[in-house]
């Protein structure tokens, strides 16, 4: 029976050994996607609860026998239950993880590494979201294991408020990249003031 658990299995960088490289997800996989499109920075009408964050995100997938995005989606569907970071920033973390996994991975030993380094504009509805000046340094490993397969998912997200011009993180909730956010049950609503932006509800 497949199950999710947090266990102490580390995806080590094998510097001395030369293991067989992990295979990339097949071309026909339903979520082997190009990076999502961003809209050019524009002046937002509403400044309420809007913050620019300098983001560094990394998602490392460790699987000795290769992996499928279907397994990653299975893991991400339980994100709310397994997330161990600051819950005022869970929405931001979901956005970053989704954007990172929508990019192209780089092989690293037995691992595949997805990285995201951006300055992104986030807006939260009402009084939700991080406190003013609050920063995030979150690192977590989630594993999926059964009798035949092991997949480790290491997530590292750092976010600090900055004054560098950024980009709106998502303008089309029907885009392909948003499938991952749907898997993680990302809670958003369309901004009434700025139709091209989305407000985080978490």
From Swiss-Prot:
InterPro entries reported for this sequence: Rhabdo_M (IPR006870), Rhabdovirus_M_sf (IPR038617)
Location in or out of the cell: Virion membrane; Host endomembrane system; Host cytoplasm
GO molecular function terms listed in the Swiss-Prot or TrEMBL record: structural constituent of virion
Site label Involved in the inhibition of stress granules formation and contributes therefore to virulence, positions: 95
One protein family per Pfam: Rhabdo_M2
Membrane topology: Peripheral membrane protein
Protein origin, superkingdom: Viruses
Region (Essential for glycoprotein binding): 115-151
Annotated segments matching region Disordered: 14-33
GO CC entries: host cell cytoplasm; host cell endomembrane system; membrane; viral envelope; virion membrane
Keywords, in A-Z order: Apoptosis, Host cytoplasm, Host membrane, Host-virus interaction, Membrane, Viral budding, Viral budding via the host ESCRT complexes, Viral envelope protein, Viral matrix protein, Viral release from host cell, Virion
Quaternary structure note: Homomultimer. Interacts with nucleoprotein and with the cytoplasmic domain of glycoprotein. Interacts with host ATP6V1A; this interaction plays an important role in virion uncoating after viral entry.
This protein's domain notes: Late-budding domains (L domains) are short sequence motifs essential for viral particle budding. They recruit proteins of the host ESCRT machinery (Endosomal Sorting Complex Required for Transport) or ESCRT-associated proteins. Matrix protein contains one L domain: a PPXY motif which potentially interacts with the WW domain 3 of NEDD4 E3 ubiquitin ligase (Potential).
Further remark: Most abundant protein in the virion.
Protein name: Matrix protein
Organism this protein belongs to: Rabies virus (strain HEP-Flury) (RABV)
